[in-house]
Amino acid sequence: MGKNEIVAMILAGGQGSRLGVLTKKLAKPAVPFGGKYRIIDFPLSNCSNSGIYTVGVLTQYKPLELNAHIGIGEAWDLDRAHGGVHVLPPYQEEKGGEWYKGTANAIYQNIEFVDRYDPEYILILSGDHIYKMDYTKMLDFHKEKQAEATIAVIEVPMDEASRFGIMNTREDLSIYEFEEKPKNPKNNLASMGIYIFNWKTLKKYLREDESDKTSKNDFGMNIIPSMLGNGNKMVAYPFKGYWKDVGTIDSLWEANMDLIREDNELDLHDEEWKIYSVNPVRPAQYIGENAKVSNSLVVEGCVVNGQVESSILFQGVQIGKNSVVRDSIIMTDAKIGDNVVIEKAIVGSGAIVRKDCKISLGDEIAIIAAKEEVKMGTVIENNKAV
């Protein structure tokens, strides 16, 4: 097997329990986003756009839909004879296998895969964040600083810093302390869960960590503190673009709504940095004679006969006559009947809302699970899936 300078590993096994019924039957990275994407499309596209063509995707929880979506990686130009994309479930041995015990253990179980390409560096990514990043710039920074580990960081509001892993740095951006969700943070440089390591160095720490039976086998809790404690040079790479952890209902809704704001930082129309995905061929969308659509994303295959305001309609969505959909996300192939009102909701893929229903919880976000049916005349008054 030939040598690669860098191999990317995407941690995509998360259950996404905070997304409730939206991840009941699929992994968090497979959750639909932005009308025609899935969350995993962002790190995969970033890798391809950065010229990184050897990518491992580490799956675990409910992987079938995610595996089918990735396939051989053709959508991201990752269907390659050398390298390409590889889906990597927890390793199975003759004595039996087990789930990944933590983020570090997930990489440890795939040391043999990485070693096939003999890389100088390894890029560790999360499969559940929305952002666009040129990883080659981060790698150049890592080399320039002669670091053994580089961690991408982003400034967050100080009153939210206690929700993140915080990097305390010197003026030269070298890291002298890492605090996991500190009660009283010293600064607001939050880890983005994006790491570049010198592979030989990381491999040594992974093996040591695996032999420690008290370890949580986690990068934030174990690997990074160990490297800092031993004096390995670690630096913070500041990122200035759009980045969103969409691990909660609120953040997923907000990230989708960001796409229809005038000051949208993500800009999915950027021809220089496209986000790729797998989408079936659909007919053009149809907007009925009495329909009204404003400030919304309406993609292929949609049929709209009602009113749609500040919403995102995924492929194949149908909106009935005299219905109003406002501030909502309607996922693939969902069907909304006649005389329905839906406000500030997420309607899962394939769900059916029969006629004469009202779904509106004021400031709360209403959730309808994928493939669920809301019966005719239903009024949803609490934040529970039907």
UniProtKB/Swiss-Prot annotation:
Instruction: Please provide the record's keywords in A-Z order.
Output: ATP-binding, Carbohydrate metabolism, Glycogen biosynthesis, Glycogen metabolism, Nucleotide-binding, Nucleotidyltransferase, Transferase
Q: Identify the Pfam families for this entry.
A: Hexapep_GlmU, NTP_transferase
Gene Ontology terms: biological process: glycogen biosynthetic process
**GO molecular function ontology, one term from the record:** glucose-1-phosphate adenylyltransferase activity
Under which pathway is this protein filed? Glycan biosynthesis; glycogen biosynthesis
Q: Superkingdom of this entry's organism?
A: Bacteria
Instruction: List the InterPro entries hit by this protein, alphabetically.
Output: ADP-Glc_PPase (IPR011831), ADP_Glu_pyroP_CS (IPR005836), GlgC_bac (IPR023049), GlmU/GlgC-like_hexapep (IPR056818), NTP_transferase_dom (IPR005835), Nucleotide-diphossugar_trans (IPR029044), Trimer_LpxA-like_sf (IPR011004)
User: Which enzyme class, named as a word?
Assistant: transferase
Per UniProt, where does alpha-D-glucose 1-phosphate bind? Answer: Y100, G165, E180, K181, S191
Q: What is its EC number?
A: 2.7.7.27
Q: What is the catalytic activity of this protein?
A: alpha-D-glucose 1-phosphate + ATP + H(+) = ADP-alpha-D-glucose + diphosphate
Q: Which HAMAP family match?
A: GlgC (MF_00624)
Q: What does this protein do?
A: Involved in the biosynthesis of ADP-glucose, a building block required for the elongation reactions to produce glycogen. Catalyzes the reaction between ATP and alpha-D-glucose 1-phosphate (G1P) to produce pyrophosphate and ADP-Glc.
Q: How does it assemble?
A: Homotetramer.
Family stated for the protein in its record? Belongs to the bacterial/plant glucose-1-phosphate adenylyltransferase family.
| Protein name (Swiss-Prot/TrEMBL) | Glucose-1-phosphate adenylyltransferase
